[in-house]
Amino acid sequence: MTAVKATPTTPPPRLPVRDKAAAGERGWGGVSPMLTRLAAEEATGVLVRERGSLHLVDGHVVHAESPSAPGLELLLTAHGTLGAEAWEAAARATDERHATTRLLLDGGLLSPGALELCHLGALYDAAYFVLAPSSTPGRFRYGVTHPIGGVRPVPVAALERETLRRRDLLHRVWPDAATDGAPLV
């Protein structure tokens, strides 16, 4: 730390202030500086945080998991879009070359549109909780991939923008902080 001796002719140095206009133009406000850095370096792996994890491929988020949000499997199987047996069979057949979702699409068991809709819903719901303020630092494991596979990669800026949009919406509807961390029902 550098100490600056202030005299009547020398004002103290200005403190850095975040430029909110520039943050808005970027599309993200720094919800997770670590995630922003990983996106900039186009990292592949998994970011594990207190409330879940985000899977990245080449700096884009391809999957998110949180115990507070329904996963892709539940969204696809809950209302008959896909049979639970078909999901389980594809998950068992998954290997390094064949992702679960690719097996379902190639087998004609799932349409690309239904998969993308459910995937984005599950990803954004889980990311909302994963990116919530945390009392512990996140950890990133390079090179880890998810067996579901990448359906539609989401840029980090879009993910953070959606997380902030959801926080703002929830705060406007119900300004009690207790609802911010409650699991989705």
PLM feature spans:
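Acidic, Ser/Thr/Pro-enriched low-complexity segments and adjacent helix/loop capping patches
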Residues: M1-V185
